[in-house]
Each structure stands twice: as C-alpha cells, then as structure tokens.
Regions:
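Juxtamembrane intracellular "pre-TM" segments in multi-pass secondary transporters
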Residues: 1-16
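Conserved extracellular-gate-facing transmembrane-helix segments in secondary transporters
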Residues: 18-30, 38, 118
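Small-residue hotspots at the loop-to-helix junctions and early N-terminal turns
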Residues: 45-53, 141-142
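C-terminal transmembrane helical hairpin of 12-TM major facilitator-type secondary transporters
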Residues: 77-124
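A late C-terminal transmembrane helix in Major Facilitator Superfamily
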Residues: 115, 126-168, 173-174
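Multi-pass alpha-helical transporter architecture, strongest
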Residues: 175-194
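Short amphipathic helix-loop junctions that connect adjacent transmembrane helices
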Residues: 31-46
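Helix-to-loop junctions at the C-terminal end of transmembrane segments
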Residues: 62-77
Length: 194
C-alpha cells in the first residue's frame, strides 16, 4: 500500500521520474556506445575501455564537486543547474550532428559532459525524493531504485527498434530523455519557498 501512496505523491514522483529519465539516457549510452565507438568510428576494441573510463572519471569528479557545493546551494537549484547543463551539452551535440559533424570526439566529449552530471543528478534526486517520502523512506528507496535501474529496459528496447548505422539513434535517445529530465527538474520546489 505504501507504493500506491508514493506513486500518487507528486513531489516524490517528480524526482523519481527525473532521475529515471536521466538513467534512460545513461543506459542508452551504456547500450549504444560499444557499437558507436567500435563499429561506427572504428575504435579498436581494446581502447573502448579507456574511452568509457573517461565518463567514470567525470562522475567521480562531479561527485566530489557535489559534496563541496551541496551545503551552499539549495538542492532543487543544484538539480536544475546540473540537468540544464547536461541538456544543453547533448543538444549542442545533436545540432552539430544535424549540421554534418560526425566525429568520434564530438560524441566522446558530449557523452563525457552529460554522463559526468550523474555525480550530481543521481545524488540530489535521491535525496529530494526520499525527503518527500517521509516515513515511507524505505519503500521510497525501493521504488526509486526499481524505477531508476529498471529504466534501462526502455532505452534498450528503443535502441533495438531504431536503425542502427550511426551515432544518431543513441544520441537521439540520450538527448530526448536528458531534456525530459531537465523539464521535470525545472519547477521550483515549493518546500523551499516557505
């Protein structure tokens, strides 16, 4: 019954759907990047891990930054900045791709910038969502985790049905869901207005 109550809790669901949307984009990268890097751009298999590790370094750096600024900034504001930054980065990549720029480094840098924001977005949305769950924080954590990590199914299914001969399908899914994430994060949190 707690899950039903939480599903109807608009503030909890706002942050849960926000992070789930971001994770659809993350899983689109995890699912699509081996094909894009190795098959589309011809990166040798043994070097894929190095390119992928750049994203992990970015997450670690942004997690460290998040720890330093979280006490100085409202969480909802920090979330808006992080999601907007990620959305702007992937949108620029898509615009450049539509203009004919199809370089490996465009994808690597764009992916690094968006993926790095996971160090802020995941931590902040989880904190805000669980705060809104109140006494049902245990059930909230379970529901949040199920939706966040279960969201990978969506990106895998979408990428399966899209034509897969370029970086466009992967970057399209990433861009759409990062923008959805930013839209969900954008309204001010009313709790901070009191």
């Amino acid at each position: 019954i707690n899950y039903w109550i939480l599903l109807r809790n608009k503030e909890f669901m706002k942050y849960t759907l926000c992070v789930s949307s971001f994770y659809i984009a993350i899983y689109a990268f995890l699912t699509g990047s081996p094909y894009v890097y190795i098959d589309v751009f011809g990166v040798p298999t043994e070097y894929y891990g190095y390119l992928f590790s750049l994203n992990i370094i970015g997450v670690m750096l942004m997690s460290a930054v998040n720890r330093r600024i979280v006490s100085a900034m409202r969480l909802d504001k920090l979330l808006r900045y992080a999601t907007m930054f990620a959305a702007i980065c992937v949108t620029i990549v898509m615009i450049l791709m539509f203009m004919g720029e199809h370089s490996l480094w465009l994808i690597v840098i764009g992916s690094f910038l968006f993926f790095s924001m996971n160090g802020v977005i995941a931590a902040v949305t989880n904190a805000l969502a669980l705060e809104r769950a109140g006494k049902m924080a245990g059930s909230g954590a379970a529901l949040l985790g199920a939706m966040q990590y279960g969201s990978g199914i969506i990106s895998s299914l979408v990428l399966t049905f899209l034509p897969n001969n370029s970086a466009f399908p992967m970057m399209s899914v990433i861009t759409i869901f990062v923008i959805i994430c930013a839209i969900l994060a954008f309204p001010r949190d009313k709790r901070y207005d009191h």
